[in-house]
């Protein structure tokens, strides 16, 4: 199962700091930052209080107003690049602060657990970024300084990302192991079930309820959700309601009008399935209360998905992945990949060589080659574009949760899945589901065990 993308399920959308799962075939490096150094966007100066002050304390470590504002700058940049309309500023600031609290608690756990990122690992990450920008390390640092960054802070960010990645891999991955008995049970259930597995695409408005909310605050938030529900059932445009009411932290969900994606039913929370079981396409659910808050669900699509056919069309593709980061905007990544495409089309460059030099995926060493893939092995947005290509054709840059891709389809063939291949496909699916569930539980546990004191609200 080498060289495979593994998608995060919709269950993780309610978290403010979702796990960056090292995908098979798109495995992030210790520092997932890429080409094109960019100065951070500017946010208007804080007023009323001093420019910097403590807004929260996680155990014994403070989070300052400036930290929140710097993180907010990055989020605003990403929202603007995605063409996302304006989001309620108070809601966004609250989400950014909560994300920083979660990350702070996880970083503390990493250090307490003896996880470390030595200078050699950070040096390597910095060298990779410089190489991807076609710069020396000295030139990279000068450019960061010119664009308002601080090289020392940049290295600290790299260190934190390495720590978080190593912690999550150590703590969460073991909880998602799939046994042979689980595979056997799944296959037996599929063979004995008469109806085909259903696939559902939902959109949601999420009015978040903080863990610390008082009964009065919960009542007010429920009333807000009820207003959104009434307008949805009155026929107002759901996308407009998402933009006005939704507190969903997943930026891709907000940009897509709250759409959660076409998934098999078992990849949605049971609460969602219960609320939408008897709804037709286009209908709106009643208010759903979860640990994250109040949800309003709209059924966008329902269809049956039969078990995988014994004979399938396999595709072999290669790709170049550039990861979006504070140093590489989505727009800059698209421009860079478009330039690569032009160079290959003009015979000035080789796709595999470009992948080896620039791709930020584990397949880079193989020239971006992802190997032969069965249907369903890649995330939907990647697979849809790949399936539209003819052998030899190169796609336009496309965005997935992993970053921005340039895909070249190499060849296609008809193949019969062996029993072992079927088992491996089931293993990957069950692992993905368990990984989502394990991360949600783990992240909530880490957050719950931390002492968090909220002070002056950020500005």
Swiss-Prot record:
Keyword Coiled coil listed: no
EC number per UniProt: 5.2.1.8
Signal peptide region: 1-23
UniProt GO BP: Gram-negative-bacterium-type cell outer membrane assembly; protein folding; protein stabilization
Reactions this protein catalyses: [protein]-peptidylproline (omega=180) = [protein]-peptidylproline (omega=0)
Broadest EC class assigned to this enzyme: isomerase
Localization in the cell: Periplasm
Keywords (A to Z) from UniProt: Chaperone, Isomerase, Periplasm, Repeat, Rotamase, Signal
InterPro entries xrefs: OMP_Chaperone_SurA, PPIase_dom_sf, PPIase_PpiC, PPIase_PpiC_CS, PPIase_SurA, SurA_N, Trigger_fact/SurA_dom_sf
GO CC terms, sorted: outer membrane-bounded periplasmic space
Domain notes: The PPIase activity resides only in the second parvulin domain. The N-terminal region and the C-terminal tail are necessary and sufficient for the chaperone activity of SurA. The PPIase activity is dispensable for SurA to function as a chaperone. The N-terminal region and the C-terminal tail are also required for porin recognition.
Protein name: Chaperone SurA
Gene: surA
